[in-house]
């Protein structure tokens, strides 16, 4: 979520936000806990909600759920979302800040000084920047996604990843909402997704860029998926010295010496490493915990995410990764539960302009619409696979960049998005189909958030600061209590 100063529209790094959020949680009878890294509060943990940061103090992230799926599941999630969003907006108001309806701040500095001033104190970022050579600062302007997560049986996981990857052009186009950067139009409707080639342009390891790109063929199974992420030609990231599942928050980590792939690392009983905080030599004991911990490595448009109930022995895990036994079966034996993380939809929220133009019914579905699309596709998996086959994997890969650049103005992207929505609608329970409302409205009118933002930007006069302030005033996210009643700006 993109945070801005309420008066100027400039990017805003939160200060008292976490204390404000804690008070709101306590007022509802919850017992929130604040999470700290390097002496700074970075999240508030409460019942079913992690109210934290993405990569910086100007870029908020709230992780919610899980909720029971099936009929009514989207409404159950929406109830949590609207409560959390109301809390976020109220907490920000206490420090003179607002959320902007955009998937990237329209005019935020990304130089090294600005980056260091607001970056979250997550140790992994030091490894990315100082050792792997990533240009992590290109995302410090709050490039924000609305990432739907949908549980999936392990036996269907690879098929589900394939479908969500293939549907990327539709998801990108329908939720495009970042046409500006540095106070200027970029020529892209979803400039947010320019992040990966820029971040990895000077990376030390070629695999980092490769793992952000959709492969040229479908994954055959989960072992195939993980071999691409963890196998020959890849380099594992730092790992915790103690047991941890929090890849951005683990505070004591080590870098394995020699830059091995994870599969090479797991094949040994011990591996030398270097402690990231002290520089001391350590010995690491390879474990299935490392397999679970490093699941973030593919920065794809969709990822399979999971959690073991108990950790399998490494020899059994390696057998499955090498295809000598079924990985899905092994993971099930050790109590793993999995879900698909969609990473294409840009952040979209109701603002006064959308409410006036599309109406309250559409505005009320904006936040949930991406989840509805993904849930519908995965509930209608066979038809979704037929759609992908009809269009062709390579053709859909080629549609991704036109979706980033032109969104629904591209005729083929528009046609594909319409077919995706039809398959998703058929997969949803009749009572849940209205959650597609925003996506349907965008498709029917070819009016993405990016299109509306560009119109606003071109209509504004004044200097750069005045234009930003005017844009921010019109892009301010409405409090859920206003979604049916806000006055037109």
Task: Write out the residue ranges for each language-model feature.
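Terminal catalytic/cofactor-binding subdomain
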Residues: 1-144, 155, 159-162, 176, ...
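Intrinsically disordered, low-complexity regions enriched in small/polar residues
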Residues: 7, 14, 19-20, 249, ...
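Short aromatic/hydrophobic contact patches that present stacked aromatics
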Residues: 61, 145-149, 341
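Loop-rich catalytic cores of soluble enzymes, especially ATP-dependent carboxylate-amine ligases
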Residues: 93, 104-335
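Long, repeat-rich segments with strong aromatic
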Residues: 284-287, 292-299, 303-314, 330-383
């Amino acid at each position: 979520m993109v945070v801005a100063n309420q008066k100027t529209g400039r990017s805003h790094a939160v200060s008292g936000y976490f204390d404000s959020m804690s008070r709101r949680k306590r007022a509802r009878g919850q017992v929130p806990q604040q999470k700290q890294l390097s002496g700074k509060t970075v999240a508030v943990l409460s019942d079913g909600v992690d109210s934290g940061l993405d990569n910086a103090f100007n870029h908020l992230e709230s992780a919610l759920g899980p909720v029971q799926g099936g009929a009514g599941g989207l409404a159950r999630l929406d109830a949590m979302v609207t409560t959390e969003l109301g809390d976020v907006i109220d907490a920000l108001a206490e420090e003179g800040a607002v959320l902007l309806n955009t998937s990237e701040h329209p005019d935020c500095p990304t130089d090294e000084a600005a980056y260091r001033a607001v970056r979250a104190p997550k140790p992994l970022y030091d490894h990315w920047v100082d050792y792997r050579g990533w240009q992590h600062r290109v995302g410090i302007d709050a490039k924000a996604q609305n990432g739907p997560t949908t549980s999936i049986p392990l036996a269907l996981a690879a098929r589900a990843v394939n479908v969500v990857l293939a549907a990327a052009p539709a998801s990108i186009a329908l939720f495009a909402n970042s046409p500006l950067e540095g106070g200027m139009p970029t020529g892209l409707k979803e400039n947010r997704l320019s992040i990966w080639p820029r971040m990895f342009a000077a990376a030390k390891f070629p695999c980092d860029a490769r793992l952000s790109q959709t492969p040229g063929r479908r994954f055959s199974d989960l072992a195939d998926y993980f071999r691409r992420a963890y196998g020959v030609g890849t380099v594992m990231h730092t790992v915790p010295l103690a047991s941890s599942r929090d890849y951005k928050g683990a505070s004591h980590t080590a870098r394995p010496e020699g830059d091995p792939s994870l599969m090479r690392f797991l094949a040994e009983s011990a591996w030398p490493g270097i402690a990231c905080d002290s520089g001391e030599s350590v010995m690491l004991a390879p474990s299935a915990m490392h397999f679970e911990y490093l699941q973030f490595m593919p920065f794809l448009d969709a990822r399979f995410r999971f959690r073991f109930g108990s950790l399998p022995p490494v020899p059994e895990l390696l057998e499955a990764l090498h295809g000598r036994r079924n990985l899905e079966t092994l993971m099930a034996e050790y109590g793993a539960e999995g879900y698909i993380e969609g990473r294409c939809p840009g952040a979209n929220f109701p603002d006064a302009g959308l409410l006036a133009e599309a109406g309250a019914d559409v505005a009320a579905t904006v936040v949930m619409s991406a989840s509805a699309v993904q849930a519908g596709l995965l509930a209608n998996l066979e038809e979704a696979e037929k759609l992908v086959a009809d269009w062709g994997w390579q053709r859909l890969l080629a549609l991704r960049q036109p979706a980033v650049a032109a969104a629904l103005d591209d005729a083929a992207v528009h046609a594909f998005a319409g077919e995706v929505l039809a398959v998703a609608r058929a997969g949803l329970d009749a009572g849940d189909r209205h959650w597609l409302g925003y996506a349907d409205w965008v498709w029917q009118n070819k009016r993405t958030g990016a299109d509306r933002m560009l119109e606003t930007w071109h209509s504004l006069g004044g200097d750069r600061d005045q234009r930003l302030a005017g844009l921010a005033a019109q892009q301010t996210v409405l409090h859920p209590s206003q979604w049916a009643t806000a006055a037109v700006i």
